[in-house]
């Protein structure tokens, strides 16, 4: 059985479990090595959904599960440390967050972390969009004001 099989919207079972707030299923899928970096048809990863839920206080347990299984060498458990590591280490398979994703989602805390760690705020992606483009397009006033 393929734990990372995708449906017609490119969502994996992990995407669905997170969106349905099924903490026990998320934990089980992560134990079986579900990939939290697979993007669905909207370009969003399970880690992104988990972070969104945790950021808005809907369900921090799911975010803790994802970060626990994706911790660096199994030693990093503090969620802020995990954010920093994930944001700055593109070699890890489960990284979804970058400057553009943070701007699109309005994660000002993460934008600050990325920029203060030396990332270029004016960097453009393959679509010639900057972080500001994504913030405006997504109507994230917090990110635009940052």
Curated annotation (Swiss-Prot):
Q: Which organism is it from?
A: Fowlpox virus (strain NVSL)
Which InterPro entries is this protein grouped with? Ankyrin_rpt, Ankyrin_rpt-contain_sf
Q: Determine if Repeat is one of this entry's keywords.
A: yes
Q: Per the record's keyword annotation, is Repeat included, yes or no?
A: yes
What are the UniProt keywords, alphabetically?
ANK repeat, Repeat
Q: Which Gene3D superfamilies match?
A: Ankyrin repeat-containing domain
According to UniProt, the name of this protein is: Putative ankyrin repeat protein FPV224
> What SMART domains does the record tag this protein with?
ANK
Q: Where are the ANK repeats?
A: 9-38, 42-79, 94-126, 127-145
């Amino acid at each position: 059985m393929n734990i990372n099989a995708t449906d017609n919207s490119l969502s994996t079972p992990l995407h669905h479990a997170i969106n349905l707030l099924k903490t026990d299923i998320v934990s089980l899928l992560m134990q079986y090595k579900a990939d939290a970096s697979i993007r669905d048809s909207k370009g969003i990863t399970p880690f992104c959904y988990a972070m969104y839920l945790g950021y808005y206080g809907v369900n921090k347990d799911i975010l803790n599960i994802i970060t626990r299984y994706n911790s660096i060498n199994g030693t990093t458990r503090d969620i802020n440390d995990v954010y920093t590591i994930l944001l700055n280490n593109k070699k890890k398979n489960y990284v979804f967050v970058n400057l553009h994703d943070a701007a699109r989602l309005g994660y000002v805390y993460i934008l600050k972390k990325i920029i203060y760690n030396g990332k270029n705020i004016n960097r453009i992606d393959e679509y010639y969009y900057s972080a500001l483009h994504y913030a405006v397009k997504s109507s994230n006033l917090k990110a635009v004001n940052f």
